[in-house]
Amino acid sequence: MTVLHSAPRWSSNEGVLDTLVAALGDMVAASREEHGEILLTVVRDRVEDALRLLRDDHEYQQLMDIAGVDYPQRAERFDVCYCLLSVTKNHRVIVKVSTDEATPVPTVTTLWPNAGWYEREVYDMFGVLFAGNPDLRRILTDYGFQGHPFRKDFPLTGYVELRYSEEDKRVVYEPVQLAQDLRQFDFMSPWEGADYVLPGDEKAVPPPPAPAPVATAPETKGDAKADVPKTTEQPADTGAGEKANDAAAKPVAEAAAPAATKTDEPAAPEPTEDRPARKPRAKKVADTEGATEPAAKPKRTRKKKEDGE
């Protein structure tokens, strides 16, 4: 048998904002509905009382998360956001308080024990202090870490480089070698009419273009088709005198290709030899059988032994 939960699958925000603002009274500093969420900004010193009232009287039983937001242009630059959930109404609400680097926020570990780690995360990342937290220390960064990484003025490269040294056989801390420029915050959007260069964008301005070179007439090495051929100006310029000038002035016809003829080319001459012919051999090679056969070996003869020897 399927048991259905009494909480609705979808809950509306209609009338919720007015009900909660009326219940909290002077503890509410501001309230609005944005992106389908109910946002309540309460007085910092009374945040514990406001959250207790929402938990006990309006059935927001669970603290789902505590988040921090940094607005460096404000005097109280940090917002601490408490995300609450009602499991019986299937509804969520966000409660916010504002603070700065030195002013602590009252802890809510007395209401939800899991708030201890959430407050430690906000302290580690943003540097927000929580008065009454029994174990307010870093939870995400390493021991001895300097600064708070989620602040807008924290450099992307950090201040210290953490690495393992093969020489020392241990983890060492070294200062970052990159140049750390001082960051300036200018929150005016360039799309709102800013007519100045934002800090860090000086290199993005293109340099003025180089002056154009003075135009000069193109140098001509000579006309490809000259109407009058170049001749000597004086007879003394050439050893041939004026006749050479007259000959140079006459147009020269282009050489034509040789006409094809149907006559056959003459045959090559017969080769001749000045050396006299060799005398014929007296005998043929076939008649020299005796000369080519090996000579016969002489036969050995033994002397007969005489009687009496």
UniProtKB/Swiss-Prot annotation:
Organism from which the protein derives: Novosphingobium aromaticivorans (strain ATCC 700278 / DSM 12444 / CCUG 56034 / CIP 105152 / NBRC 16084 / F199)
UniProt-annotated location(s): Cell inner membrane
Name of the protein described by the UniProt record: NADH-quinone oxidoreductase subunit C
GO CC list: plasma membrane
Enzyme class: translocase
Protein family: Belongs to the complex I 30 kDa subunit family.
Position of the signal peptide: none
NCBIfam families xref list: NuoC_fam, PRK06074.1-5
Enzyme Commission (EC) number: 7.1.1.-
Compositional bias of kind Low complexity: 246-261
Composition bias, Basic and acidic residues: 220-230
Cell membrane is among the record's keywords: yes
Subunit comment: NDH-1 is composed of 14 different subunits. Subunits NuoB, C, D, E, F, and G constitute the peripheral sector of the complex.
Cysteines paired by S-S bonds: none
